[in-house]
Amino acid sequence: AVMGRNLALNIESRGYTVSIFNRSREKTEEVIAENPGKKLVPYYTVKEFVESLETPRRILLMVKAGAGTDAAIDSLKPYLDKGDIIIDGGNTFFQDTIRRNRELSAEGFNFIGTGVSGGEEGALKGPSIMPGGQKEAYELVAPILTKIAAVAEDGEPCVTYIGADGAGHYVKMVHNGIEYGDMQLIAEAYSLLKGGLNLSNEELAQTFTEWNNGELSSYLIDITKDIFTKKDEDGNYLVDVILDEAANKGTGKWTSQSALDLGEPLSLITESVFARYISSLKDQRVAASKVLSGPQAQPAGDKAEFIEKVRRALYLGKIVSYAQGFSQLRAASEEYNWDLNYGEIAKIFRAGCIIRAQFLQKITDAYAENPQIANLLLAPYFKQIADDYQQALRDVVAYAVQNGIPVPTFAAAVAYYDSYRAAFLPANLIQAQRDYFGAHTYKRI
C-alpha cells in the first residue's frame, strides 16, 4: 500500500491527475485525507475507477505478488477495452509475468511487468524502473515512467525498455540477487574488521566513510556508515542490540533457482542466500557454539594494512558478484529471447535503486566497448582490478579460514575466480565416475 501510494504521489507531482482505488475504502480515504490539494481522485468501485481513465487506459497495479495480482487483473478485465495497458509494479516472479502477458495478449490487452527498485523513498522521489512487455505498449507509458524515474548524475532517467514479457521482472529479480550478495559481502567485511582488528563502531563508521569516498562509493556503503553510529533510546549502539537473524522475501532464492535452471554458476549470490538461512538457525547455532570447537581469532596484524586488504577484497568480491549476475542475465536473454542490453541495464541501476554504485558506470563502459563479452571479469578494467586485488582477497580468506571467521561469499569469490580462469578442472574424474556407475559415457580430449 505504501509503495502504491508513493508512486501515485510521484506521478501526481509530475503534473498528472491520478485516479486511485484500493479494495479497502478506508485506505483510499486515508490517502486522500493525508494529501489535501493533490490531484488524486478517489474511486470506490473498480467499474468507476476504470471508466475514469482516458483510453488507452494505463493502470498501475501495486499489490502483493501472487494470487492477489491475478485477482486484481480479473476484477479489471470486464471493464477494459482492447489496447488498454496494465502495469504490474510488484515483486512478481518472472514466469508469472510471462504467463499473464500471454493470457492478456490473447484477449487484446497489453501487460507490462515492471521491476521497481528503491523502496518506499525511491517510489516517492524517483525509483529505478525496469519495464518488460509489448514494446508498443511501453511507448505509451514511457513518458510517465521517464518523468517519475530516478535521474543519474549525467541527467539520464533510470528507466529503459528491458525486453518482452517477463524481462523486466527478471532483471529486477537478478538486481535483488546482486543486492543479497552486496549486503553479505559488506557483512563479512564488518565481521573481519571486528574479529581481526576489534574496531569500535566509531572506527567502523570512519572506515566506511573513507571507503564511500573511493571505488566502493555506493548506497549500501553509505547507509552502513550511518548504521554504525546510530544509537537506541538507551544510548546503546543499535547494531549491537539487533538479533543476528537476517530475514528474506524470497527474491534471492528465485535468482538462485533460475541459475540452477539455466546451468549458471551463481555461487556468490547463492551463498549469500544460504548465509541468511543459516543466520536464522539462531537456537541451533547457540547450542553448537557450546559443542563444536574452532580456533580463536588472532589479531590480524597492522591495522591500516588489514583494512586496505579487506577493502580490496570487498571490491573484487563485488565485481565477481556482478560478473555472475550479468552472466546469468546473458543466459536468460538467450533462453527467453529477450535481447537484453546489459550496458543499459547497468545504467538504470546508477540511481534510485538499492544497488546504486559508482562502479556501475564501469559495467556500462565494458559493454559499450564489447557488447558480446562473455564475462565482465574479462573486460580490461575488471581484469586489472583482479590482477591488483586478488592477493588481498586470498589473504583475507586465508586469515578468515585460519581464525574461524565465516566468509562464505568472500570464499565463493575466490573459488569462482580460480575455477573460471582454470583451463583444466578435475571434472574428467567426475565424468569417469558417472560412466563407471551409470554408463553415462564421456568425451575424449
Swiss-Prot record:
Enzyme class: oxidoreductase
Annotated GO biological process: D-gluconate metabolic process; organic acid catabolic process; pentose-phosphate shunt
Pathway assigned in UniProt: Carbohydrate degradation; pentose phosphate pathway; D-ribulose 5-phosphate from D-glucose 6-phosphate (oxidative stage): step 3/3
Binding site for NADP(+): A1, V2, M3, G4, N22, R23, S24, V63, K64, A65, N91
Keywords from the UniProt entry: Gluconate utilization, NADP, Oxidoreductase, Pentose shunt
Binding site for substrate: N91, S117, G118, G119, H175, N176, Y180, K249, R276, R434, H440
Reaction it catalyzes: 6-phospho-D-gluconate + NADP(+) = D-ribulose 5-phosphate + CO2 + NADPH
GO molecular function, one term: phosphogluconate dehydrogenase (decarboxylating) activity
This enzyme's EC code(s): 1.1.1.44
SMART domains linked: 6PGD (SM01350)
Pfam families tied to this protein: 6PGD (PF00393), NAD_binding_2 (PF03446)
Record: active site: K172 (proton acceptor), E179 (proton donor)
Superkingdom: Bacteria
Main function: Catalyzes the oxidative decarboxylation of 6-phosphogluconate to ribulose 5-phosphate and CO(2), with concomitant reduction of NADP to NADPH.
Stated family: Belongs to the 6-phosphogluconate dehydrogenase family.
Subunit structure: Homodimer.
Descriptive protein name: 6-phosphogluconate dehydrogenase, decarboxylating
Source organism of this protein record: Shigella dysenteriae
Lineage: Bacteria, Pseudomonadati, Pseudomonadota, Gammaproteobacteria, Enterobacterales
